[in-house]
Amino acid sequence: IYPVLVIKNTRLEKEFLDEKYTPLTVVQAVETCKELMSMFNQKGIEVIRVGLQNTDEITDPNIEGSEVVAGPYHETFRQLVERAMYYDMVVEKIKKFNTKVKEVEIRVNPQTVNNVVGYKRQNIEKLKEFYDVDVIVKQDIKYPVEKIDVVVTKEYKDFLEEDEKELSMKK
């Protein structure tokens, strides 16, 4: 799966410079490739490469000598996609709990831990920011590489429940 990069001295570069073509951002490309990889995985189709291999010419557009003018270039693009997929798996598992989750423990194989945690802990930070969930990651060599388990370790108490308990204690 190769997101489109604008390469120097191509027709696409001209269209880009003439503002007739707008490349995807890295975030947009990760989201698109994540959906494609999920679809292929469900069909049992192995994805052997995601994103162009880094070379002297195919590298960050900001580096001198790069032939890439614009587009969703990242030297570890596949890992960004895989980490986004693991984030979605964790969120899906958390949403299945019929409770207000305050803290979870994620159990993973040590080979998978980087995908679960995310680049610069982004997945952990997003869980805290968007779902107000604290995360403890436990590594277990017994877990298969692709498997993760999410266990609720703390729940938020409903303020109405707390008020009812206080009232019944006062009686």
Task: Identify the residue ranges that each predicted region occupies.
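Conserved C-terminal portion of the radical SAM core fold
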Residues: 1-18, 25-56, 97
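A generic membrane alpha-helix/interface feature
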Residues: 18-20, 62
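Radical SAM enzyme core and accessory elements
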Residues: 57-171
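Short, basic, helix/turn surface patches
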Residues: 22-34, 160-170
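Alpha-helix N-cap and loop-to-helix initiation/capping positions
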Residues: 20-28, 82, 119
